[in-house]
């Protein structure tokens, strides 16, 4: 067919007959996929937590170019199981205890399927009213559960790193409104604790504050920020002609899950007119429990707070929420509307594109809406209480075992501990445990020492899994010593 003929052909490549075949193919494949997903969620423990692959194995196994002709769903599903699955680290595995769990619960998975089918893009209200308004409703529900003030406006981003970057950019906007046009001043200073997440420094790099202008506030023996030293550092920087503009307090640090004294940090922030951002990406969910709500004491005085439902609210990645009591400043920092996106203003229409860098927006709120409704507050509270109780029990086992020592408080369900030996011996122990495929742990460094981490929070984890994890660790300790890789008792 000539180009002219092709250009004049108004028949869709998917005519009605082909569309019917396409729909039937999809129906069969989707049913197979749902059956596979249900079986996987029920039997994830059949797989090794970590895949037994080497870097480059999957690249070498797959074709070097895409096919010229299309392939049937059956071939795609077959290759998924035979080639992709063996290279997967199973975050849904009950014994995935390396990082804060990102468990894909059934209601959220169903919601993700529906969101993908709708394929809506929530650029502004008109492009998808449901995206804009369900986000407001769902984040309002969660705000109530967390005990945050009603004036806190919520918006969804993908990860806490991005949420915090937007908060810090808003902080810069409050301190230096000219930065949007002229760029950052060189004397802006940001404060955060020695235990804060690396994304805070990355945010300073990304928005032009500079890594050298990030002050790491020392922590106490429980790895919590010291507000007295924060006050001293801010005073010194002001005296030196610098402009402190933001402080980040953490509720549930990544290494130890320590909780900074937010109320005391807020006092310093108010004294020096700093934007207070609270990183509650992990532990914020615990505030749903009445007995844990104190961890957010002082957060009502913050300018912004981030929490991640994809960490401990059984919502698959990615979904991070930024709450702020100054949405006007956040909007001022980012709103930039080209003519083709201008729509009629309405007081109840929220255009989410005005509150961040991304223009395109997935329907992320749908999966959180499904999760909150499916489990309910009481169901989520039961799960959180179980995880925290198991974490406390694991900590007690460590305390009772002479060969091990706990090196940090365990306020939630993450325990930091180490074998009473060298860093090399602890590293060897971790390598053996993870290579077994029975359990996946991670490590950190505290006070210059190599430390093991157990993070309990997976939806499928049982008390028996936690017990098994401890026995696996103890067993490999004995075995590693027997192989001569642990040298000291």
What are these regions (language model features)?
Residues 405-433:
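Conserved PLP-binding catalytic core of the aspartate aminotransferase-like
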Residues 159-331:
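Conserved PLP-enzyme active-site core in the AAT-like
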Residues 446-489:
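PLP-dependent enzyme catalytic core of the Aspartate aminotransferase-like
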């Amino acid at each position: 067919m000539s180009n002219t003929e092709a250009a004049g052909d108004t028949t869709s490549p998917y005519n009605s007959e082909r569309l019917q075949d396409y729909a039937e193919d999809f129906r069969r494949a989707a049913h197979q996929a749902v059956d596979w997903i249900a079986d996987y969620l029920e039997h994830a423990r059949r797989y090794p937590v970590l895949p037994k692959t080497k870097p480059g194995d999957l690249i070498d196994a797959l074709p070097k170019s895409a096919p010229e002709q299309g392939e049937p769903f059956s071939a795609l599903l077959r290759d998924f199981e035979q080639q992709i699955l063996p290279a997967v680290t199973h975050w849904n595995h009950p014994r995935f205890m390396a990082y804060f769990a990102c468990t894909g619960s059934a209601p959220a998975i169903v919601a993700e399927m529906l969101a993908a089918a709708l394929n809506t893009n929530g650029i502004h209200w008109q492009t998808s009213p449901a995206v804009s308004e369900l986000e407001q409703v769902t984040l309002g529900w969660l705000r109530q559960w967390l005990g945050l003030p009603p004036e806190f406006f919520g918006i969804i981003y993908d990860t806490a790193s991005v949420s915090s970057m937007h908060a810090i950019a808003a902080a810069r906007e409050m301190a230096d409104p000219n930065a949007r046009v002229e760029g950052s001043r060189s004397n802006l200073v940001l404060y955060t604790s020695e235990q804060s997440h690396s994304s805070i420094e990355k945010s300073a790099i990304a928005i032009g504050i500079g890594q050298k202008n990030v002050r790491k506030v020392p922590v106490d023996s429980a790895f919590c920020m010291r507000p007295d030293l924060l006050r001293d550092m801010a005073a010194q920087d002001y005296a030196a002609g610098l402009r402190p503009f933001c402080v980040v307090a953490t509720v549930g640090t990544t290494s130890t899950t320590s909780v900074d004294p937010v109320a005391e940090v807020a006092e310093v922030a108010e004294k020096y007119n700093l934007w207070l951002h609270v990183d509650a990406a992990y532990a914020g969910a615990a505030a749903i429990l009445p007995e844990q709500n104190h961890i957010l004491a002082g957060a009502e005085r913050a300018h912004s707070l981030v929490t991640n439902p994809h960490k401990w609210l059984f919502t698959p990645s990615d979904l991070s929420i930024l709450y702020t009591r100054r949405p006007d400043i956040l909007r001022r920092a980012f709103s930039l509307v080209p003519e083709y996106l201008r729509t009629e203003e309405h007081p109840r229409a929220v255009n989410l594109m005005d509150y961040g860098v991304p223009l395109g927006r997935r329907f992320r709120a749908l999966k959180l809406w499904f999760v909150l409704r499916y489990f309910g507050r009481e169901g989520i509270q039961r799960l959180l209480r179980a995880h925290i109780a198991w974490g406390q029990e694991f900590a007690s086992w460590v305390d009772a075992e002479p060969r091990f020592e706990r090196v940090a408080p365990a306020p939630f369900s993450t325990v930091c501990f180490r074998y009473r030996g060298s860093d090399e011996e602890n590293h060897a122990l971790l390598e053996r445990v993870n290579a077994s495929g029975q359990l996946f742990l991670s490590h950190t460094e505290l006070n210059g020492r190599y430390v093991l981490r157990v993070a309990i929070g997976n939806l499928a984890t049982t008390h028996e899994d936690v017990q098994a994890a401890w026995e696996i660790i103890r067993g490999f300790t004995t075995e590693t010593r027997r192989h001569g890789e642990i040298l000291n008792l």
